[in-house]
Amino acid sequence: MAGPRYPVSVQGAALVQIKRLQTFAFSVRWSDGSDTFVRRSWDEFRQLKKTLKETFPVEAGLLRRSDRVLPKLLGQASLDAPLLGRVGRTSRGLARLQLLETYSRRLLATAERVARSPTITGFFAPQPLDLEPALPPGSRVILPTPEEQPLSRAAGRLSIHSLEAQSLRCLQPFCTQDTRDRPFQAQAQESLDVLLRHPSGWWLVENEDRQTAWFPAPYLEEAAPGQGREGGPSLGSSGPQFCASRAYESSRADELSVPAGARVRVLETSDRGWWLCRYGDRAGLLPAVLLRPEGLGALLSGTGFRGGDDPAGEARGFPEPSQATAPPPTVPTRPSPGAIQSRCCTVTRRALERRPRRQGRPRGCVDSVPHPTTEQ
């Protein structure tokens, strides 16, 4: 690879809550065109600020205030000021996420000597925990509404969304109700975007008309490569997304060079230990042993999800049209009343609030199944 890379932009992606510990997920764009997801805590940012002051005393204004170029990281009192009267750790966490994003952007906008220093490059480089294929049990990921940019609005309305929802297709026709008690009819081969997966087997999906509904997971399967909602070919999403557990330097022309934490698309797998991958605008071979399913990146981008016993991303065939006459998939047992909401965070429950349920069942729907959150 030509020269060391350095971060060029940082964007706040999500608030990750693990029991009582809050960490902040960021999407980091690098000088080589790649992007990675990292998680950092508030204390880690405070330690970064301290290290920068020791490493760059002039830029920190320790000798003369007029020479200061390092941005300030507001303290706890300044952070809580815009949130007076508001209740909840989630609101404060989202405010911190916005504040840390602003601080990170200002750091990268300082002098090149500081912005490209090993201190900042190392801080935003993926760490072993960032490369884990799954978040710790009990983790909650809270996404801020995209349009809520100002800090003063960070504790406002929230929404469940995906940065890039995964598109799955329906195996057979199925009728249920959406989150507003309207008929939700899915046809065979229809593409649905998965917004939220729940262990009960009922997933929150969205159709082309922007209707959202709880839908049985056995009725869904991965769409064929290049057959998204728009129906056009897309090399950028032609395979599952994996993460490089460590850096790799190519030794042949048909191989790829990737840094640690690089997110690659697997175009073709092989039992010989080398997979054909796409990284940026280049395609080449990578050792399969270096690749692992994404954890946080998959959750935030909605891609790379592999279910069942297929964690290694092995190629799977797609059913022929004649298989549409096969017996309908088994519908999972609906959870007990309130089971899904009890497993969701407060943000999710608020996003799923709806009008009072109407009486009667929708017309033209055979064996209509209410979504699990509407049972009384």
Swiss-Prot record:
GO terms for molecular function: enzyme binding; phosphatidylinositol binding; phospholipid binding; superoxide-generating NADPH oxidase activator activity. Residues 1-131 form the PX domain. Residues 328-337 are annotated as: Proline-rich region. PROSITE patterns: PX, SH3. GO terms for cellular component: cytoplasm; NADPH oxidase complex; plasma membrane. Residues 163-225, 237-296 form the SH3 domain. Residues 326-335 have a biased composition (Pro residues). Residues 302-376 are annotated as: Disordered. Keywords: Cell membrane, Lipid-binding, Membrane, Repeat, SH3 domain. Expressed in testis, small and large intestines, liver, kidney and pancreas. Isoform 3 is mainly expressed in colon. Isoform 1 is preferentially expressed in testis. GO terms for biological process: extracellular matrix disassembly; regulation of hydrogen peroxide metabolic process; regulation of respiratory burst; superoxide anion generation. Changing residue 202 to R: Loss of ability to activate NOX3 and interact with CYBA. Induces interaction with NOXA1 in vitro. Gene3D superfamilies: Phox-like domain (3.30.1520.10), SH3 Domains (2.30.30.40). It holds the Pfam family SH3_1. Constitutively potentiates the superoxide-generating activity of NOX1 and NOX3 and is required for the biogenesis of otoconia/otolith, which are crystalline structures of the inner ear involved in the perception of gravity. Isoform 3 is more potent than isoform 1 in activating NOX3. Together with NOXA1, may also substitute to NCF1/p47phox and NCF2/p67phox in supporting the phagocyte NOX2/gp91phox superoxide-generating activity. Interacts with NOX1, NOXA1, CYBA/p22phox and NCF2/p67phox. Interacts with SH3PXD2A and SH3PXD2B. The PX domain mediates lipid-binding, localization to the plasma membrane and is required for NOX1 activation. The SH3 domains mediate interaction with CYBA/p22phox. Also mediates intramolecular interaction with the proline-rich region. This is NADPH oxidase organizer 1.
